[in-house]
């Protein structure tokens, strides 16, 4: 099976006063290009540790991660990361925060082209009228919109999201879920998202990877989510299959998360839209 991201027998062990603690053990996952994968499990099970290793922000104890044929050994612009807190520089405007990364990635583009890229993604996330405000002048939801725009503007090969909406109220969370889906469907980036929200996982993902409880957490089960795209929240909530899958996830989290069954095979890749015009500039850097 052709994989865009391949995680093989991944281990993460931390030293403690009582001896080594293995947080993640024998974690295997294959993700195809264009898939949106949700990684779900109880708090503290190691979800964010796995994502951090994929991002190159945490060292791997054993095993390996290969992205687009290259081994992951450190952080890099081929992976755009959105954290729970957007980590914006407070003395820069939203536009300037996005431009920091754009200037590094599109270094051969003209200044005008780089500005257009930053403005394009800030407009897509709804910050056209607020892009020249500093983070202290923005709401938490607006700051997270900026974080999402910054990640997409880098034109990464893969998008990594670590509970990006966990600090938001429900209404803002739903709005930003739709913003994320619109951007993802527009750019068709491969995405791996950590969440503890069952409904969020069902709404966003093509497959949901369920992790067992830690320590020594691993893949417990994988659920395929076959709802057609683009997805409509109201239609999903009226679909009996949505509640069947929801119950399956809740049952795993409540009853089966201590077990370690073998994962299922990955779903087929999502279709890739043709690039044209402005997209060609972005895709040129994404493939380099």
Describe the residue ranges of each PLM region.
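The feature captures the beta-strand-to-loop junction immediately N-terminal to the Walker
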Residues: 40-42
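Conserved ABC transporter NBD signature motif
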Residues: 63-75
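Short coil-to-helix segment of the ABC ATPase nucleotide-binding domain corresponding to the Q-loop/switch region
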Residues: 92-101
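Hydrophobic anchor residue at the start of the ABC signature
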Residues: 148
């Amino acid at each position: 099976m052709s994989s865009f991201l391949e995680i093989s027998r991944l281990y993460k062990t931390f030293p403690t006063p009582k001896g080594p603690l293995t947080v993640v053990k024998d974690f295997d996952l294959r993700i195809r290009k264009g898939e949106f994968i949700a990684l779900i499990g109880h708090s503290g099970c190691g979800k964010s540790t796995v994502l951090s290793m994929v991002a190159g922000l945490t060292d791997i104890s054993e095993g390996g991660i290969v992205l687009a044929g290259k081994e992951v050994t450190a952080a890099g612009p081929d992976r755009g990361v959105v954290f729970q807190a957007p980590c914006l520089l407070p003395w820069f405007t939203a536009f300037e925060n996005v431009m920091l990364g754009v200037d590094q990635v599109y270094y051969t583009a003209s200044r005008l082209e780089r500005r257009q890229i930053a403005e394009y993604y800030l407009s897509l996330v709804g910050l056209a009228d607020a892009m020249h405000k500093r983070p202290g002048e923005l709401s938490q939801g607006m700051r997270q919109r900026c974080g999402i725009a910054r990640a997409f503007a880098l034109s990464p090969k893969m998008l990594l999201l670590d509970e990006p909406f966990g600090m938001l109220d429900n209404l803002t969370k739903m709005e930003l879920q739709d913003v994320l889906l619109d951007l993802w469907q527009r750019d068709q980036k491969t995405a791996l998202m950590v969440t503890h929200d069952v409904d969020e996982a069902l709404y966003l993902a093509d497959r949901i990877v369920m992790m067992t409880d830690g320590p020594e957490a691993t893949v417990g089960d994988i659920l395929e989510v076959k709802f057609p795209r683009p997805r409509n929240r109201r239609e999903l909530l009226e679909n009996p299959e949505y509640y069947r899958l929801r119950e399956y996830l809740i049952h795993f989290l409540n009853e089966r998360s201590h077990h370690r069954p073998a994962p299922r095979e990955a779903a087929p890749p999502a279709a890739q839209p043709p690039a044209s015009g402005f997209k060609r500039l972005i895709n040129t850097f994404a493939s380099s």
